[in-house]
Structures are given as C-alpha cells and as structure tokens.
Regions:
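N-terminal [4Fe-4S]-dependent radical SAM core
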Residues: 1-36, 68-72, 76-77
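Short, flexible active-site-adjacent loop segments at beta-strand->alpha-helix junctions, enriched
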Residues: 17, 27-29, 40, 89, ...
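Short linear Ser/Thr-Pro motifs
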Residues: 3, 37-38, 51, 119, ...
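Canonical Radical SAM [4Fe-4S] cluster-binding loop centered on the CxxxCxxC motif
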Residues: 27-64
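A C-terminal junction/extension of Radical SAM enzymes
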Residues: 2-9, 235-244
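Conserved alpha-helical substructure of the radical SAM core
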Residues: 53-82
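Conserved AdoMet/S-adenosylmethionine-binding subsite of the radical SAM
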Residues: 73-82, 87-241
Length: 244
C-alpha cells in the first residue's frame, strides 16, 4: 500500500506459520526509515492502540525482523538508513530476540546502531538491562500521559511500573549510555491535550536531556479516542516551558 502524498509504503508480510505483521517504509530528506514489528499481536493493552485488540500470538524471531528490512529494500529499491522498532508488539517484551536482531543488523549490514530506535511502553526492568548493554541505540518511550492516574487509565502497564519508576529508569539509561531519551506523546482530544497536562509534563521532565515527539493519536475503528486539534498549541506550551 503506497501513499500518494509522501511515498510511504506499508507492507503486510506473511510468516511461515501463516501469521502476518505490518512494516512501514518512510522516505525523508535525510534518507529512508523503516518501522518494523517485533511481535505478532501485543500483550500491553494500551487502549488507543490497534495492535493489542486481537491479543498476543507470539514473539518474532530475529530472522523475521531482518526479513522485514531485506524484503522492503528489495521491493522498493531503496537503501534503508534508519530502523525503528515501533510496529506491532512491545519490543522489550521480546528483548532476547530483539537484542539478537540488533547484533545481527550491526554485524551483517554494518549499520550503526546509533541509527536504530527501540520503542517501549515502559518495561522498567528491561530498560535497565538494555542500558547496561550499551548498544548505542535511541530509546523511545511511549509516555502519552504525565500523571499516574491518567496514564493508568489508558496504559495498563502503568499499574505495574509507575511513572516515577519509569523516569528513574530513563535517567539511568541516559547516564549509562549518553543517549537522550525520546518521549512519544500521542495527543488525544479531551484527554491529554490541555494546559494542565502540559504543565504536568513540563514538571515531570524538568532537568532531563530529552526530546518530546508530539503526534495526534491514530484513530482506530475499535476505539473511542479522537485526534486532538491542539497539537501546535500544546507544542508551543512545551517550548515556552523549555522542552523541545
């Protein structure tokens, strides 16, 4: 499936057991980026995410992660410069295979892992383990809410690992690797897109060397959440408060 707007290509890859995963190839001025899946389905239960609706089936093997890159390069004729583990699944819930994949990617493709981003919804114990490996990757944390009450209402993982624990793990990651954290924040209309949310986020991230990536939430047919129309307004509130 190819976008008429920006040459983005979405692939649906069939696996040997009949399961399927999605991969997205994106073209930017600085090169080509690919977003790959790490699991078939997902256990995490984030209420705004389509990947979790059908439940969890299995982890992907390292070879199945590499396949998404190789086949997308072959089909598109484009050289991939940046890899993002942010497709279907929670990468750190499949951490052993993800680390094997990263080592294979670095060894076989001579790709610097500094051009790889790994996403997590907040598996705190795995963040510490990943930090100690010092792979040089960017850690992208799906935050989406600045308080425990709000985050727990949309992300069940927050009942297991509270925001305070997550922040400590992120600080450890930065201090251990020197790589700043990227926080993903999907703005949901009437949920997390107001001044109160922005002020709480500024307070939460104060003093951190980090980046905040604001995106309007993807509306899904199974969900009730709507895209916020206040992305630029919210962004300006963060900039005025000293975040970027």
């Amino acid at each position: 499936l190819v976008s008429d707007i920006d040459n983005t290509v979405k692939y649906l890859y069939g696996l040997s057991d009949g399961e399927k995963v999605e991969t997205v190839l994106m073209e930017y001025k600085h090169g080509n980026s690919i977003c790959i899946s790490t699991q078939v389905g997902c256990k995490m239960g984030c209420k705004f995410c389509a990947s979790t609706k059908a439940g969890f089936v299995r982890n992907l093997e390292p070879s199945e992660m590499l396949l998404q890159i190789y086949e997308s390069e072959r089909d598109s004729g484009r050289k991939i410069n940046h890899v993002v583990l942010m497709g279907i699944g929670e990468p750190l819930d499949n951490s052993d295979n993800v680390v094997k994949f990263l080592r294979l990617l670095s060894a076989k493709d001579d790709m610097s892992l500094r051009h790889v981003s790994v996403s997590t919804c907040g598996l705190v114990n795995r963040i510490y383990e990943l930090a100690d490996l010092k792979l040089g990757i960017t850690l992208s944390v799906s935050l989406h809410a600045p308080t425990n009450e709000l985050r727990s209402s949309i992300m069940p993982i927050n009942d297991r690992f509270r925001i305070e624990e997550l922040m400590e793990a992120c600080k450890y990651y930065f201090n251990t690797t020197g790589r700043r954290i990227s926080y993903e924040f999907a703005l949901i209309d009437g949920v997390n897109d107001n001044r109160q949310s922005a002020d709480a986020l500024l307070k939460l991230l104060k003093g951190q060397n980090c980046h905040v990536n604001l995106i309007p939430v993807n509306e899904i047919k199974e969900g009730v959440f709507k895209r916020s129309a206040s992305v630029e307004k919210y962004k300006q509130m963060l900039i005025d408060g000293g975040l970027n």
